[in-house]
């Protein structure tokens, strides 16, 4: 009875807060503490319910109400948990993006940790192939120096140095002979005439070694022929004719270089069958045939260009007609390209006059007139400036 009186003397706000804080726990404790002689008075938290039911209620009805509230609360929490998946999906997508970023971080850290070991391995590989790397750098430097010098001498025309051209010829020939003499035991010069060098077993690096050296030597050989043409006096072979010879030699060099690596690569591809079973041998034959087909397609793809070069070389198309003195006087007798008096003036189809040598050098790279941009030449005459292709034919 004292406990019930204490409940009566408690302020309504306190009872309301306790009921709101733990309604189910309060109902259970109340139900468990009832005795036959005690009187329990239910204090409702809502004013509406208090006005409708001023009398005391059955404890079980309070328990049921509390149970209903607990079930309703659980249902609401369950409904909220089902309404959250879109947020969860957004969170998962964010985690996926952060996961991919973390993978890149791990990869970067792995590279940082592995860098010393990669350097050690790289130094070891360089030391194993130091001869080939040094020789490749030397051949490339020689080619760049000779190619630039030949182009400069062709551009100078009558002012070119015969001594410089002779030095380039001796330098290229001496470099080739010294290289083959140093490695005479391998008979690398055999590959120039479509024969295999004297190597028992060809590995991948040895194939690259043979093909690379042969390609540079062929370039040196045709560059030496260009030096010989430079040494020919202009009264025997005009500069215009020399340009056509440079173009023809370069095209011949490129087509010859297409076929030279074929025997070496064919032997390397087909050599798999010597140490394997029938399947491996068949695979080697198939790879070799596929290589030959690709080389033939490459050749026929360049055949059209080669025919155009031959047609230009034999027909020697003109860009105009010789200009008269009256026509030159109308142009003040000065060539707009060289800013000097006309030397063998040529009247283009667009009625502009230039020196024959000046306009020939111009059309080595361009198709249009220098002044009015009228198309005069149908094709660009490549390689007439004496240049050599820097492409390395490794296959």
Curated annotation (Swiss-Prot):
Zn finger intervals (RING-type): 335-373
Subcellular location: Early endosome membrane
Swiss-Prot/TrEMBL catalytic activity: S-ubiquitinyl-[E2 ubiquitin-conjugating enzyme]-L-cysteine + [acceptor protein]-L-lysine = [E2 ubiquitin-conjugating enzyme]-L-cysteine + N(6)-ubiquitinyl-[acceptor protein]-L-lysine
Keywords, in A-Z order: Endosome, Membrane, Metal-binding, Transferase, Transmembrane, Transmembrane helix, Ubl conjugation pathway, Zinc, Zinc-finger
Region (Required for ubiquitin ligase activity and for protection against ER stress-induced cell death): 328-379
GO molecular function: ubiquitin binding; ubiquitin protein ligase activity; zinc ion binding
Tissue specificity: Predominantly expressed in testis.
GO biological process, one term: positive regulation of ERAD pathway
Pfam families per UniProt: zf-RING_2 (PF13639)
Topology term for the membrane: Multi-pass membrane protein
Enzymatic class: transferase
Residues covered by region (Disordered): 1-58, 78-97
Record-listed E.C. numbers: 2.3.2.27
The protein's role, per its UniProt record: E3 ubiquitin-protein ligase that acts in the endoplasmic reticulum (ER)-associated degradation (ERAD) pathway, which targets misfolded proteins that accumulate in the endoplasmic reticulum (ER) for ubiquitination and subsequent proteasome-mediated degradation. Protects cells from ER stress-induced apoptosis.
Descriptive protein name: E3 ubiquitin-protein ligase RNFT1
Gene name of this polypeptide: Rnft1
């Amino acid at each position: 009875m004292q406990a019930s009186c204490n409940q009566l003397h408690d302020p309504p706000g306190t009872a309301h807060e306790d009921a709101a804080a733990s309604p189910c726990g309060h109902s259970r404790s109340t139900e468990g503490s009832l005795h036959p002689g005690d009187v329990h008075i239910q204090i409702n938290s809502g004013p509406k319910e208090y006005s409708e039911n001023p009398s005391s209620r059955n404890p079980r009805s309070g328990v049921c109400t509390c149970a209903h509230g607990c079930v309703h609360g659980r249902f609401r929490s369950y409904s909220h948990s089902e309404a959250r998946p879109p947020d969860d999906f957004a969170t998962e997508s964010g985690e996926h993006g952060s996961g991919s970023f973390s993978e890149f971080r791990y990869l970067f850290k792995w590279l940082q940790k592995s860098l010393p070991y990669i350097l050690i391995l790289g130094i070891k590989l360089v030391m194993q192939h130091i001869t080939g790397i040094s020789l490749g750098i030397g051949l490339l430097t020689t080619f760049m120096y000779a190619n630039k010098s030949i182009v400069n001498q062709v551009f100078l025309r009558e002012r070119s140095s015969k001594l410089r051209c002779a030095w380039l010829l001796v330098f290229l020939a001496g470099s080739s002979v010294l290289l083959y003499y140093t490695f005479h035991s391998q008979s690398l010069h055999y590959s120039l005439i479509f024969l295999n060098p004297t190597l028992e077993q060809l590995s991948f690096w040895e194939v690259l070694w043979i093909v690379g050296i042969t390609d540079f030597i062929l370039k040196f050989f045709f560059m030496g022929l260009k030096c010989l043409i430079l040494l020919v006096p202009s009264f025997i072979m005009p500069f215009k004719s020399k340009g056509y010879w440079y173009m023809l030699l370069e095209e011949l060099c490129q087509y010859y270089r297409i076929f030279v690596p074929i025997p070496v690569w064919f032997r390397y591809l087909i050599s798999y069958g010597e140490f394997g079973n029938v399947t491996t041998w068949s695979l080697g034959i198939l790879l070799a045939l596929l290589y030959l087909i690709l080389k033939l397609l490459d050749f026929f793809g360049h055949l059209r260009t080669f025919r155009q070069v031959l047609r230009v070389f034999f027909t020697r198309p003109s860009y105009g007609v010789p200009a008269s003195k009256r026509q030159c006087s109308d142009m003040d007798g000065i060539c707009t390209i060289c800013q000097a008096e006309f030397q063998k003036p040529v009247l283009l189809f667009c009625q502009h006059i230039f020196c024959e040598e000046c306009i020939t050098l111009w059309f080595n790279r361009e198709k249009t007139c220098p002044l009015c941009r009228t198309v005069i030449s149908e094709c660009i005459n490549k390689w007439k400036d004496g240049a050599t292709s820097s492409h390395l034919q490794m296959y």
